[in-house]
């Protein structure tokens, strides 16, 4: 596992801990306040971060839910200079909620048509 993969895995543990304590507000605040680095050093950093998070999720000892996965992805992208936003959306029938990450209005860690399925509730 690469250094980026290790960072993703450790962030999965951290955000899992917050969610296990029922502390959505802390998770939300951490993602919102995560600073964006001045510049990205690699042109394909978005793909590399998403791939590292995917691999970390495979090796994680339990199922990683969309909120945890999106929080990790958004924070890592911000740390590497990408203005990422964790997006939370919901649909009415049947009721479902989902979280994903967008960069410049495009979904980067999930299916690209999510905005057509879910009404956006918030972005951070």
Where are the language model's segments positioned?
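Helix-boundary/low-complexity linker signature
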Residues: 1-124
